[in-house]
């Protein structure tokens, strides 16, 4: 297996995940800011690795597999951390909705790939907007420097949950014929 810069960036994102968890639980005043910084660095690599892979024509099968896995693991763990911190339905409900959607759509994409129709459930613009809203909301909720950033983070978290449901309905609609076909 050949490693290139986009794949190394994806691996770097995976390596950052345990550091995010450890720093999140440190009993220091700077821990929320540093955990948010780690998350932001990881989130930026999510955009940057794909950009470089396309720009430099360095897409690999391993990278195509690892990138969405790293993204989903990073986001799911950040959601679990934020949910654990707030201990409230208004954070848990959107987090559970978004995690469930990721599982459903991952299964749908795998199934559609088996049918040779993976492109019918390719990432859409609404999925990209959803991911951006998730990343920004999670960064704010990890950082939480003041009540206004927390409120904005929670509001954006709900926006991300709505976009999550919207994009899921789009993907399911695109696959409807195959899902209902005998």
UniProtKB/Swiss-Prot annotation:
GO molecular function terms noted in the UniProt entry: CDP-diacylglycerol-glycerol-3-phosphate 3-phosphatidyltransferase activity
Family annotation (Pfam families): CDP-OH_P_transf
Domain of life per record: Bacteria
InterPro entries: CDP-alcohol_PTase-I, CDP-OH_P_trans, CDP-OH_PTrfase_TM_dom, CDP_ALCOHOL_P_TRANSF_CS, PGP_synthase_bac, Phosphatidylglycerol_P_synth
Disulphide-bridged cysteine pairs: none
Transmembrane segments: 13-37, 61-81, 87-107, 146-168
Gene Ontology CC terms: plasma membrane
Recorded metabolic or biological pathway in which this protein acts: Phospholipid metabolism; phosphatidylglycerol biosynthesis; phosphatidylglycerol from CDP-diacylglycerol: step 1/2
Catalyzed reaction equations: a CDP-1,2-diacyl-sn-glycerol + sn-glycerol 3-phosphate = a 1,2-diacyl-sn-glycero-3-phospho-(1'-sn-glycero-3'-phosphate) + CMP + H(+)
Cytoplasmic side: 2-12, 82-86, 169-181
Keyword ATP-binding: no
Periplasmic side: 38-60, 108-145
Keywords associated with the record: Cell inner membrane, Cell membrane, Lipid biosynthesis, Lipid metabolism, Membrane, Phospholipid biosynthesis, Phospholipid metabolism, Transferase, Transmembrane, Transmembrane helix
Keyword Transmembrane helix: yes
Record localization: Cell inner membrane
Recorded topology in the membrane: Multi-pass membrane protein
GO aspect biological process, one term: phosphatidylglycerol biosynthetic process
Enzyme Commission number(s) of this protein: 2.7.8.5
Sequence similarity: Belongs to the CDP-alcohol phosphatidyltransferase class-I family.
UniProt-listed PANTHER family: CDP-DIACYLGLYCEROL--GLYCEROL-3-PHOSPHATE 3-PHOSPHATIDYLTRANSFERASE 1, CHLOROPLASTIC (PTHR14269:SF62), CDP-DIACYLGLYCEROL--GLYCEROL-3-PHOSPHATE 3-PHOSPHATIDYLTRANSFERASE-RELATED (PTHR14269)
NCBIfam families: pgsA (TIGR00560), PRK10832.1 (NF008090)
Record's function text: Catalyzes the conversion of cytidine diphosphate diacylglycerol (CDP-DG) and glycerol 3-phosphate into phosphatidylglycerol. Essential for the synthesis of anionic phospholipids, thereby playing a role in balancing the ratio of zwitterionic and anionic phospholipids, which is thought to be important for normal membrane function.
Protein name per UniProt: CDP-diacylglycerol--glycerol-3-phosphate 3-phosphatidyltransferase
Species assigned in the record: Salmonella choleraesuis (strain SC-B67)
